[in-house]
Amino acid sequence: MGEEPRLPKHNEEEMQENEQPKKGILSCVSSPVSWFKMLAKELHWSFVFGVMVVYGISQGLGGSLARVGTEYYMKDVQKVLPSEAQVYSGITSIPWIIKPLWGLLTDVVPILGYHRRSYFVFAGFLGVIAMLSLSLHNELHIVLALLFLTAGSASVAIADVTVDACVAQNSGTHPSLAADMQSLCALSSSIGSLVGFSISGIFVHLIGPQGVFGLLMIPAGLVLLVGVLVKEPRTSFVEYKQINQNFVNASKAVWKTLKLPDVWRPCLYMYVSFSLSLNISEGMFYWATDSKAGPSFSKELIGYIMAIGSIGSLLGALLYQYGLKDYPFRDLLFWSQILSCLAGMLDLVLVRRWNLKFGLPDILFVVIDASVSQLIGRLKWMPLLVLSAKICPPGIEGTFFALLMSIDNAGLLTASWLGGLLLHVFNLTPTLLYSQMRFWIRTRIQVFKNLMMLNL
């Protein structure tokens, strides 16, 4: 047989050069798909599905709709002052503060033989009832409204604790995939938030805040579905007799782990870092939507601004996954903390209207502010999540991870209530917020000094 004719060398090189761009484009699509397949193969598809539902749909999409809907519900339906709305926001976040309780229950109290599945079902059912009640009653008393909003928050918190326990458990059995699992959580949350904020303003405008609460029954129903589908071995009946002993053992294990310097120091850092940054987001929201001195953003625009801000969170998750996950832990926290302090000063620039002096329209500056703040916040959050997942003792993953996350939430609650106190003491209504920002300048400068002196 004769030899097949060979192409000239320069023709082969040209063909390879022409194929390289195609391979580059295909790799951009195939790489994430391969990553998802790898996670599904190593960790089971139901786990990946559960993470995407809880973080992407329940917390991301649902959380975005709930945030915008609740802010307009308090402002337009309940007609409360900014300082009151700030305090009420802290009350509805209490289920996130007591996350260790949910974690302890999922670890030591199986329901119908399951540690995780039953709690997913309960969380989904609770969310459906709470959102249905809010959507159907037009003139709810503020106490009942807070009760249902807190129940809805508890629904999301319980699902979050349960899926975090699954993540921590898998991080113990697959330590090499710990960062990948946190990236999956972060990407799901960021994409869900992006979609949720994009449509939140439109839905609030079209169907009102209570209509949005009705839509939130869908994410809660999907969480219930996760409880049906997630893979988990059934607990033997003998374990029910050991619940009291399990409580004691879990408490001892948590306390023993917390006393380690490598554990309590990051915990202290997390609390101080969040609590020192006073939060007046409700006052800023009222000012941005109502005050004549402010930009008077519409409902749709508020949703779009938050959506674009979520792009920053998504970019932060991608940047961590593909560039910073192997970066030294302390260095990453140090620089993200400094950048976080600087980003916190951007609100001051907006309220003082300095952006207009530089020719930056309000909408453009707010978008930049939201994107930068979300990106830095995600970079600051990711290494803490990875560390928290890795130091969880085996057998009490849900309890300990929930405890670590509740420390963060306690810091956020402290910042929120201190911010509400600031709004109340200085009578910072929407029209007075602008004129009283001198105090806010001094507060931010002091916070920056405190965090710079923090021993990382």
Question: Which residues are covered by each model-predicted region?
Answer:
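Loop-to-transmembrane helix entry/capping segments in MFS-fold secondary transporters
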Residues: P82-S83, G172-C185, K299-E300, L364, ...
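Glycine-rich segments within core transmembrane alpha-helices of 12-TM secondary carriers
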Residues: T92-P100, S176-V204, M306-G312, M405-L418
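Hydrophobic core of transmembrane alpha-helices in multi-pass small-molecule transporters
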Residues: I57, A130-L132, L136-A159, L356-P383, ...
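Transmembrane alpha-helices of Major Facilitator/SLC transporters
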Residues: P95-W102, I302-Y327, W335-L348, L412-A415
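C-terminal ends and interior cores of transmembrane alpha-helices
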Residues: V121-L140, I338-G359
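Transmembrane alpha-helix termini and helix-breaking/packing motifs in multi-pass membrane transporters
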Residues: L104-I111, L132-L136, S193-G214, Y320-D326, ...
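Intracellular loop-helix junctions on the cytosolic face of multi-pass helical membrane proteins
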Residues: M1-F47, I129, S135-L146, A154, ...
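Loop-to-transmembrane helix entry
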Residues: G50, K79-I94, S176-L184, M284-G312, ...
